[in-house]
């Protein structure tokens, strides 16, 4: 009898036995940590009405419908396989809110269509938390502190933690006067030569030119502060001051890098953003931020902030780290 070779779709991801073991160990540690911090574990449904994603707008943009796995129910309504965890938890908070604040944790997969040639998987395992309804200062410090504690539980040796501001980025785009798309691309790629060419082609003020030319500096805080202060722009200055305050308050836990060129990964981020990286990975291992505007779509007004661990990236980084240690 001929043996049939059943292949996985190229976009699918199948964890190895060691990856599953590592995942469950990390889950156990993080469940314990989240429980100690009073975060309740929730399990959103795998499917949501597509309208949950397409009807919500943030900063004039909608979610990328081309990346959604959509299906038609027998009644004719469109439903979508879970695209992310944040929106379902915003919906949950708005529906069952019985207090001024809520703390949720989650463990599971999200599903997004990806192009084959990019080598990305359409299914990604995430572990994360969301905090709703606390005051801005309290919630931001709580989440940042918890994110740093989570990083310590991952088992990765060399990590860095960066913070940025969506408000700072949005103000830069306003000052760029119609060149938002190009500026965003240059900042995402951290293309210094391209950024210098962009600056020369535009009639920016001397102070803004000075800031943009050195915006990728991350190890000279006083120099960055002077460059921002010289712009005399209230939004840029207040955003930087907030990041500096977070850096100073959390530096006893772990050194914090301020990245003024950080670009929001999700359109709904409104203020603080942060990412963590490992020397054993080429993608962020953790990312998060503030997204207050999303709640207004559910007739709620409250501060909202959260983050997620990108477990597929983390598990591969752990394997690479172990391999490097064995070769030393």
From Swiss-Prot:
Gene3D superfamilies: Bira Bifunctional Protein, Domain 2. Keywords: Amino-acid biosynthesis, Cytoplasm, Histidine biosynthesis. It holds the Pfam family tRNA-synt_His. Pathway: Amino-acid biosynthesis; L-histidine biosynthesis; L-histidine from 5-phospho-alpha-D-ribose 1-diphosphate: step 1/9. CDD domains: HisRS-like_core. Coiled coil: none annotated. InterPro entries: aa-tRNA-synth_II, aa-tRNA-synth_II/BPL/LPL, HisRS-like_core, HisRS/HisZ, HisZ. It is found in: Cytoplasm. GO terms for biological process: histidyl-tRNA aminoacylation; L-histidine biosynthetic process. Signal peptide: none annotated. One of its GO terms (molecular function) is histidine-tRNA ligase activity. GO terms for cellular component: cytoplasm. Heterooctamer composed of four HisG and four HisZ subunits. HAMAP family: HisZ. Required for the first step of histidine biosynthesis. May allow the feedback regulation of ATP phosphoribosyltransferase activity by histidine. Belongs to the class-II aminoacyl-tRNA synthetase family. HisZ subfamily. This function is generally fulfilled by the C-terminal part of HisG, which is missing in some bacteria such as this one. The stability and homogeneity of the HisG-HisZ complex is apparently increased by ATP and 5-phosphoribose 1-diphosphate but decreased in the presence of the regulatory inhibitor histidine. This is ATP phosphoribosyltransferase regulatory subunit. The lineage of its organism: Bacteria, Bacillati, Bacillota, Bacilli, Lactobacillales.
């Amino acid at each position: 009898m001929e043996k049939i070779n059943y292949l996985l779709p190229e976009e699918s991801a199948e964890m190895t036995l060691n990856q599953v073991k590592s995942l469950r160990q990390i889950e156990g540690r993080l469940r314990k940590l989240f429980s100690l911090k009073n975060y309740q574990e929730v399990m959103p449904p795998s499917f949501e009405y597509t309208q949950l994603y397409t009807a919500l707008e943030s900063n004039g943009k909608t979610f990328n419908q081309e990346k959604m796995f959509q299906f038609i129910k027998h009644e004719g309504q469109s439903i979508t396989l879970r695209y992310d965890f944040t929106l379902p938890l915003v919906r949950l908070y708005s529906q069952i809110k019985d207090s001024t604040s809520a703390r949720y944790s989650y463990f599971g997969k999200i599903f997004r269509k990806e192009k084959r040639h990019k080598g990305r998987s359409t299914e990604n395992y995430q572990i994360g938390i969301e905090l709703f309804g606390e005051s801005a200062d309290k919630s931001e410090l709580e989440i940042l502190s918890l994110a740093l504690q989570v990083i310590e539980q991952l088992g990765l040796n060399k990590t860095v933690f960066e913070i940025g501001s969506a408000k700072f980025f949005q103000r830069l785009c306003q000052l760029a006067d119609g060149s938002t798309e190009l500026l965003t691309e240059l900042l995402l790629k951290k293309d210094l030569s391209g950024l210098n060419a962009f600056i020369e082609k535009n009639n920016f003020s001397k102070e803004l030119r000075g800031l943009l030319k050195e915006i990728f500096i991350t190890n000279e805080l006083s120099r960055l502060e002077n460059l921002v202060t010289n712009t005399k722009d209230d939004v840029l200055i207040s955003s930087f001051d907030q990041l500096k305050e977070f850096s100073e308050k959390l530096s006893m836990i772990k050194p914090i890098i301020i990245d003024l060129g950080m670009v929001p990964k999700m359109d709904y981020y409104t203020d603080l953003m942060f990412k963590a990286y490992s020397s054993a990975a080429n993608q962020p291992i953790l990312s998060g931020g503030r997204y207050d505007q999303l709640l207004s779509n559910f007739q709620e007004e409250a501060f909202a902030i959260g983050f997620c661990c990108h477990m597929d990236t983390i598990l591969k980084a752990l394997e690479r780290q172990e391999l490097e240690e064995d070769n030393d």
